Swiss-Prot record:
Residues 557-576 are annotated as: Disordered. Guanine-nucleotide exchange factor (GEF) that acts as an activator of Rop (Rho of plants) GTPases by promoting the exchange of GDP for GTP. Residues 119-485 form the PRONE domain. GO terms for cellular component: plasma membrane. InterPro entries: PRONE_dom, RopGEF. One of its GO terms (molecular function) is guanyl-nucleotide exchange factor activity. The lineage of its organism: Eukaryota, Viridiplantae, Streptophyta, Embryophyta, Tracheophyta. Interacts with PRK6. The keyword Cell wall biogenesis/degradation does not apply. This is Rop guanine nucleotide exchange factor 13. Specifically expressed in mature flowers.
Length: 576
């Protein structure tokens, strides 16, 4: 009986697939297995296409492995026990798997499918590995693909990589909607690659080490740099807060967007085609948004405002820690007065000086003018700071003047206050000349990563806040059509070339018949002396009457300290 079974086994052996020998083969074994399946199909049907061959060979890996039968032998069904019958009852059913209808148990299908999942995960891992190699190769080459000496520094290459990644992953957020899962997955994966560099930026720290004999000695050990330990986790949390905020708008259906130029947008009273012509127009129901959605939008705006303020604070601190390049210092004039101009210099040297009132009197009707004013004050701050440092060597210093130390410190503090107000009032403004110069010539990789990461989060938060304010503004204009007509009239006046040169002041609710004349410097000084009323009330009134400003829901201007202490949205929607 034993010999008969051995002979039967030898009879079946040539028909079995010798897996052990295939595993021992070299790389050609993979081609051997494919030749067995592909060639057999092509011999049977020479005209078969590649797609059919791939489908049949791919499904061969999930076919049930059955014992080989003899030529004349018929398959004998095995009688299952009662326990097996009860266990398999309800489990076995006809399942269509890759075009084949066979009777499999669900466990068999799951095992086969998990095998395919493992293969797909492996190929995804290989693809991600190649992407990582490509990205870090560009970083090591300094963005110079020729491999020459024209590449940028590692700090600037990482900064540009983070900036370009944010631009390609998020793009320009034109609608208040959730970001797709593919974009979020790509963003989290690739930003993790770039931030992993900070794990290897260390600093020496003294620690006490106890020897075997009980003696103690102080040794230097390495740990991650302190500023990176505090800033990187904070920025990651802000990143998640922004993505979660956008995800919450996934299922909303009360407002929608229409493309500019469509028939529905032409019938709208919105001025989006004028001040934000590149953005789709927000459409809300005729009766406006529901109270639930309004409260939700306000809460999300407060959350995004917190993210914006935190990212701005981190970015400002990092830029302050960066060294000022010598090329920027060489381009500065010798006096701060020459950088500001005579009129601005006289205004900031007044004994009764108010930074908020100063900004209200300046022409901030365009982003170019705001950026120009910011560049002037940053240059003057650098000049005065260098003079304060070099005050002890007046005879040999080219920066020496007749101004006293207290006067320079006072001017430097006033200029710094104005810069803080500009940054808080216009968070979406472009980078100044000093900031660009610092980023370009910075050599600290840790500071470069924190600065670029905080900058893109600041820009993203500002954009999301602007989209939320667009929806709230559309709801306000829908409920109050007269306000929309007033806004259209004001926008047309500001676009008129005849009225651009003169400062045009008008109330949004009560437009005066005559325009106020231009206020000269002497009138401003006399007004400051003779007026006994609080200057805050006039500041609030003039803020509402500024033609270049957008329609504001509040009639009270928030100061810089109030903006930092609360979550009120800054008036950042002008240039977004």
């Amino acid at each position: 009986m034993v010999k008969a079974s051995e002979k039967e086994h030898e009879k079946y052996k040539p028909k079995l697939f010798d897996l052990e020998n295939v595993k021992k083969k070299n790389s050609s074994s993979r081609h051997f297995k494919r030749w067995n399946s592909d060639s057999a199909l092509r011999i049977e049907d020479p005209d078969i296409d590649d797609g059919t061959v791939f489908k049949k060979t791919a499904t061969s890996s999930i076919q049930p492995i059955l014992p080989v039968l003899a030529m004349d032998e018929q398959p004998q069904p095995r009688e299952a026990t009662d326990e097996e019958s009860q266990k398999d009852s309800g489990k076995r059913e006809i399942i269509s798997f890759l075009g084949y209808n066979e009777k499999f148990t669900r466990d068999q299908v799951i095992l086969r499918f998990r095998g395919l999942q493992a293969k797909s995960c492996y190929f995804a891992y290989v693809t991600e590995l190649e992407q990582m190699k490509d990205k870090f190769a560009k970083l090591l080459l300094g963005e110079d693909m020729s491999g020459g000496s024209k590449g940028v520094s590692s700090a600037l290459a990482l900064s540009n990589a983070i900036t370009n990644l944010a631009a390609s992953a998020f793009g320009e957020i034109r609608r208040l909607e959730a970001i797709s899962e593919d974009k979020k997955e790509r963003w989290r994966r690739e930003i993790g690659w770039l931030l992993s560099v900070t794990d290897h930026i260390v600093e020496f720290s003294p620690t006490h080490q106890t020897n075997e004999d009980g003696s103690s000695m102080e040794v230097m050990t390495t740990k991650q740099r302190t500023d990176l330990v505090s800033n990187i986790p904070s920025l990651k949390k802000l990143d998640e807060m922004l993505l979660d905020c956008l995800d919450k708008f996934k299922d909303q259906d009360e407002f929608y967007y229409v493309t500019p130029g469509s028939p529905e947008s032409e019938n709208s009273n919105s001025t989006r085609n004028d001040d934000k012509w590149w953005l789709p127009i927000v459409k809300v129901p005729p009766k406006g948004l529901s109270e639930t959605l309004k409260r939700f939008l306000l809460s999300q705006r407060e959350c995004v405002c917190q993210v914006l303020n935190s990212a701005m604070a981190i970015n400002s601190q990092v830029l302050t820690e960066m060294e000022i390049p010598e090329s920027y210092i060489d381009s500065l004039p010798k006096k701060g007065r020459a950088s500001l101009g005579d009129m601005i210099y006289r205004m900031i040297t007044l004994e009764m000086f108010d930074a908020e009132q100063f900004l209200l009197e300046m022409d901030l009707s365009s982003e170019h003018k705001i950026l120009d004013l910011k560049n002037k004050f940053e240059a003057s701050v650098v000049i005065w700071q260098r003079k304060i440092v070099q005050i002890d060597n007046k005879s040999s210093s080219p920066w020496s003047t007749n101004l006293s130390m207290d006067k320079r410190q006072q001017l430097e503090e006033r200029a710094a206050t104005i810069l803080q107000l500009i940054k808080q009032e216009f968070p979406g403004i472009s980078q100044s000349t000093l900031d660009i110069s610092k980023i370009q010539f910075n050599r600290d990789i840790g500071l470069a990563i924190v600065e670029s990461y905080s900058r893109i989060l600041e820009s993203l938060a500002h954009t999301v806040m602007s989209r939320i304010e667009d929806v709230l503004e559309a709801d306000q204009l829908t409920q109050n059509p007269e306000l929309a007509m007033c806004k259209i009239h004001i926008v047309k006046e500001t676009e008129s070339p005849e009225k651009e040169e003169e400062p045009n002041f008008c109330l949004l609710e009560d437009r005066p018949k005559k325009q106020k004349p231009t206020i000269s410097l002497s009138e401003v000084m006399q007004w400051n002396i003779e007026t006994n009323e609080p200057r805050k009330e006039k500041s609030d009134k003039k803020l509402l009457t500024r033609v270049s400003s957008m329609i504001m829901s509040n009639n009270k201007k928030t100061t810089y300290l109030e903006s930092l202490g609360t979550t009120r949205s800054p008036t950042a929607g002008r240039y977004s």
